[in-house]
Amino acid sequence: SPSTRCGTTGLRPTYGRVTRSGAMALSWSMDKVGPLCRSATDCAIVFDAIRGLDVADKTLLDAGFTYPGEVDLSSLRIGYFKSDFDDDYEVSKFDKQTLRTLKKLGAELIPVELDNDDLPYYAMSIILEAEAAAAFDELTRSDRDSLLVSQHRYAWPNKFRIARYITAVEYIQA
């Protein structure tokens, strides 16, 4: 997520709350548009300004929004996938800091262990990567994806190339 990579606070709103009209989608069926800000309060202010109906995006709901500001987290139990926080990766320090902050604010953190078979990651990755490959098809077919700086195994240009082999059946079943 972009906020994790730059150390800011991000809000990924529920699908249908903020227009995607004019945004460059990576995955048209899963993408959401939300603010990147200095704090949760700033995110709430920006979200309140950008939410709502747009004639160019028929997926939107006109639902109210209130943000109380100060919230007592001591009554919250927050589950997190422990295995996702065990590894050291490029932005793991931000993820681990989030857990420490939630605990400091009084939330009860509950590590959850699930088999990979129980997680929808595979289905989500098929959808995300197939739609991203379609969105960036012209970039891939013209070989301009080779101009992108990051070319490691899991970089987007390689995901675009590999996703061209996802069948329609796999995509629909995901």
Write out the residue ranges for each language-model feature.
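Beta-strand segments within the central parallel beta-sheet cores of soluble alpha/beta enzyme folds
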Residues: 59-62, 112-114, 152
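Short, surface-exposed loop/helix-turn segments at secondary-structure junctions
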Residues: 60-61, 123, 173
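Acyltransferase
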Residues: 90-115, 136-147, 171-173
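A short helix-breaking turn/cap at a secondary-structure junction
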Residues: 9-97, 142, 146
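Conserved strand-to-helix beginnings and helix N-cap segments that scaffold or border functional pockets
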Residues: 2, 89-92, 122
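Short helix-loop capping/hinge segments that flank enzyme active sites or metal/cofactor-binding pockets
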Residues: 72-81, 126-174
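Acidic helix-start/capping segments at beta-turn-to-alpha-helix junctions
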Residues: 115-127
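FAD-binding core of FAD-dependent oxidoreductases
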Residues: 1-10
